[in-house]
């Protein structure tokens, strides 16, 4: 408490994590990011609080919850980035870091989706495969960049990509 008074910090970081598939902390990709975030935060003397739309039994916005908890900043992971409450939080005075989504004037941690798909297709091609299919997630900016990279890499390798080879699927299915 004395340190918080002296530094004007709470040493509490918020995490906004909502997984549409309800896989919780078992999500293969985001669980690793969150564990790394938690470990680094703790190593720096911070606590981590999950942010949601409830403060006790009262509904609140994400920003209200962050203010209620007095977080020094918030990491936004795996949410609908177009949700008005997420936009309110991102546009607030709080420091915000987003994962796999970019906002102007905010820090983002993003995957190199173009290079990742390019590496994957080149690897499969190098193993002798010539009929390569691609299953992508719901239409988002991340999906668009992955699809564009898939088509471009296949084109560069001289591969034909029939429409039937590209399909939408769930990123993660709990069942």
Where are these regions (language model features)?
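Bacterial carbohydrate/catabolite-sensing allosteric modules
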Residues: 33-47, 91-98, 102-175
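Residues at alpha-helix caps and immediate loop-helix transition turns in enzyme cores, especially N-
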Residues: 26-29, 85, 143-146
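Amphipathic helical "hinge" segments at domain boundaries
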Residues: 2-62, 72, 151
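Short beta-strand-centered segments that line the small-molecule binding cleft or hinge
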Residues: 59-115
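Short hydrophobic segments within beta-strands
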Residues: 16, 51, 77, 134-135
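Short, glycine/serine-rich, charged loops/turns that create anion-binding
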Residues: 20, 55, 81, 103, ...
């Amino acid at each position: 408490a004395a340190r918080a008074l002296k530094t004007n910090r709470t040493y509490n970081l918020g995490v906004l994590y909502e997984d549409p598939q309800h896989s919780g902390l078992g999500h293969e990709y985001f669980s690793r990011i969150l564990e790394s975030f938690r470990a680094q935060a703790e190593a720096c003397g911070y606590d981590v609080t999950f942010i949601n739309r409830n403060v006790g039994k009262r509904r609140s916005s994400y920003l209200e919850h962050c203010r209620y908890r007095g977080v020094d900043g918030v990491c936004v992971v795996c949410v609908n980035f177009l949700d008005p409450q997420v936009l309110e939080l991102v546009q607030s005075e709080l420091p915000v870091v987003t994962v796999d989504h970019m906002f102007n004037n905010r820090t983002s941690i993003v995957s190199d989706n173009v290079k990742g798909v390019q590496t994957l297709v080149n690897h499969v091609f190098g193993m002798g495969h010539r009929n390569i299919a691609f299953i992508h997630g719901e239409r988002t900016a991340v999906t668009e960049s992955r699809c564009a990279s898939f088509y471009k890499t296949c084109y560069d390798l001289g591969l034909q990509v029939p429409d039937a080879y590209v399909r939408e699927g769930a990123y993660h299915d709990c069942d």
